[in-house]
Amino acid sequence: MAKAGDYEPIEINAYFRSHTHLPIWEILDKAGFWDQVAIKVNFEYCDSSSEAEAALFDGRVDLVSGNHISPYALVAKGKPIVSLASPTNGVSDRLVSREPVGSVAQIRGKRIVDTTVADQGGGYNHIRGNHMLYVLEAGLELTDVQWVEVADRMSSEFRTAQFHAMKEAEGDATFVTGDTQKYEQAGFSVLQLPRLPMINGPTLTTTVTVLNKYDRFGERLVLAQVLGIHYARTHREETEKLLEDLKQREPEARGVSYNSVAKLLAKPYPDHQAVANAYRLCCMKAPEAKEVSPLALWDLHFLRQLDNSGFIDRLYEGR
């Protein structure tokens, strides 16, 4: 494995698609792992998958943290988008309802508060897609519930509108990712749902063009992420201090916790069921994605080479 001095220093622009991704990037920055691979990263938030992809293709950014659904359709269109690693492969949402329910199947005929399927720019709202899969997996059709759409994208504004809609009885139920304490305090029923395999979180998304542009770019990205994950999993006290600093600086990240990085996979391979579900969501919106295998999006050889070298196993020896 190359040492930091072996890499040509580069500076890149990047987007993160959710503030929940920030913890691992904070660790890479503050613990020196970007420096170790000689990359300076200028991260900015982007709330639309279509805008992030446009920036990738026109060269405004070289990396996107996220974009989990629409890339499969872009591959079918001949675009050079590629994903290199998936540190998280599942979601565990909760169903909040006005009346207690024992399963998602019991919301037939109910009003469900959510985002639109697509934002104003045409980008896919991944969270809404997850909720659609929960409905389908329960044996219902998407038309068996009434979708009350209160925002065109996942945001703090949506979360405020979501809670308001439930309080004002504009909806009967809603799916919530993360903390549901305010709903419980308001007297709503909360049902923990089973884990849904799904590509999500700080996925490394770039293009074949960029991989060819910079010296060993894919190798460096994967190595830095693997090192950051190892640090988080083995240096809890230092990681929690970094996250406290992040929460003080970024209001949108105030809900992050140590578990948000401790749960990341030591070997961030995508799970096959998670890929299948992400691909399924894409095909629902863009049937042309069916023309190519979902595996065409993934280039895992950088991770496989790192893994095969024994580097990752050696990191965790003696834990």
Model-found features: residue ranges?
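Secondary-structure end/capping motifs
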Residues: 214-291
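Proline/Glycine/Serine-rich low-complexity intrinsically disordered segments
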Residues: 101-105, 208, 212, 267
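Short, glycine-/small- and polar/acidic-enriched structural segments
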Residues: 2-149, 175, 190-198
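Conserved C-terminal helix/tail region of periplasmic/extracytoplasmic solute-binding proteins
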Residues: 283-319
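Extracytoplasmic/secreted proteins, especially bacterial periplasmic and envelope-associated proteins
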Residues: 23, 29, 51, 55, ...
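Pocket-lining segment of extracytoplasmic ligand-binding domains
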Residues: 69, 150, 154-246
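Structured segments of extracytoplasmic/periplasmic soluble domains
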Residues: 31, 55, 59, 110, ...
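Small-molecule pocket liners
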Residues: 89-95, 199-204, 208-209, 278
